Amino acid sequence: MEEGKQEASMPLVPIDSFSYSWLVNFPSLEATIDDHHQTYEDSSSSSSFIEMDPRLPPSRRFFIKTSHESSFKFDNFVSFSDEDHSLVHADELFRDGYVMPYRLKPTSAATEEESEPLDTTTSEKIDTRGLNSKPSPTSSRKLRRVSKWVLLKYLDFLTPLCKRLRRCRSAVTTGSIGMDSRIRVTTSCRSRVYSDEMTSSPRISVADDYYWRRSCDSESSIYEAVLHCKKSFEK
């Protein structure tokens, strides 16, 4: 009873409203939709194969036509020509789940150029030209000037160096000559003193003889050291 009272209390939909007119004209709208659907099928049956039925719920509204239900091959709709490289078959790009590199096929003109043998006469001519070509006089003059300039630079560097080496050698030789003369003078003086002592006193103690031999050994060692240094400088 309460539900009946609530329905009676609800206001009725006015006749001029859009919802009321749409409900009244629903069969005619359905017929026009069917006609439009049929004309669309006739006009685009050759190009499209997925159709929509507005009367079905959204989950089942799209369906595939029977002529293409079991066919998923798109080769009939796309043409792969040998000359057009913008379209490539999927089998050439994908293999075992990996993307493979695609290389463009060479055209007929490129293959003909690669297959043509090289002209041996032209290559021989080029080789003979390279061998027979003589250097120009200007280039030879430039080379001579450069070589002369390099030699002059080397001479400017070597001449002062040679002068310095000569000065060093002359200084070393004069120093060694002076040392030799000094050693000779000292040895001669000592020998004279020793000879005088021998003549004056015929008896010489053993200690004096030992010290004299020791001094002679030291002088001879010094003389040998000086000679060794002199030889090393000369080398």
Curated annotation (Swiss-Prot):
It comes from the Eukaryota. GO terms for cellular component: plasma membrane. It is found in: Cell membrane. One of its GO terms (biological process) is abscisic acid-activated signaling pathway. Residues 108-140 are annotated as: Disordered. PANTHER family: MEMBRANE-ASSOCIATED KINASE REGULATOR 6-RELATED. May be involved in abscisic acid signaling by acting as a kinase regulator. This is Probable membrane-associated kinase regulator 6.
